[in-house]
UniProtKB/Swiss-Prot annotation:
Disulphide bridges, residue numbers: none
PANTHER family xref list: RNA POLYMERASE I-SPECIFIC TRANSCRIPTION INITIATION FACTOR RRN3-RELATED, TRANSCRIPTION INITIATION FACTOR IA RRN3
Gene: RRN3P1
Record-annotated membrane-spanning stretches: none
Protein name: Putative RRN3-like protein RRN3P1
Lineage, highest ranks first: Eukaryota, Metazoa, Chordata, Craniata, Vertebrata
Organism of derivation: Homo sapiens
Cross-referenced InterPro entries: RNA_pol_I_trans_ini_fac_RRN3 (IPR007991)
């Protein structure tokens, strides 16, 4: 394992550990997103599994919220969730060309498998909380790549 992968693993452990303070978890999520999105030396072979981990964690988080009374938009309650959402959206914004490369139909299979629709349409409403610039770019890219408005 290289330094970059070890750093990502360290950040991932901090993000998903509920015993860590929320601010530490959120900072870890923010670093993951920035690192995956902007570090040119991070290959797609590393980016995809990290996105898979983040998105899977988001879906599990949503599963746990579906039956609860705290399933509403609140940064104080769900800060690490929103941080992970922004990490995913930010990474997708900067890596979408690589993630969608090749045949359009085949290229769309990967983002479809992530089920962004469930995340963005959830009661936690991450598009309301994440940075507007990230949300706007994410929405524009998903709209453009689907040839019309919609979430794969």
């Amino acid at each position: 394992m290289g330094f970059a992968e070890a750093f990502l693993e360290h950040l991932w452990k901090n993000l998903q550990d509920p015993s860590n303070p929320a601010i530490i978890r959120q900072a870890a999520g923010n670093y993951i997103g920035s690192f995956l999105a902007r570090a040119k030396f991070i290959s797609l072979i590393t980016v995809k599994p990290c996105l898979d981990l983040l998105v899977n964690w988001l879906h599990i988080y949503l599963n746990n919220q579906d039956s609860g009374t705290k399933a509403f938009c609140d940064v104080a309650l769900h800060g690490p969730f929103y941080s992970a959402c922004q990490a995913v959206f930010y990474t997708f914004v900067f890596r979408h060309k690589q993630l969608l490369s090749g045949n359009l139909k085949e290229g769309l299979q990967y983002p479809q498998s992530l089920n962004f629709e469930r995340i963005v349409m959830s009661q936690l409403n991450p598009l309301k909380i994440c940075l507007p610039s990230v949300v706007n770019f994410f929405a524009a890219i998903t709209k453009m790549k689907t040839c019309g408005y919609g979430w794969w």
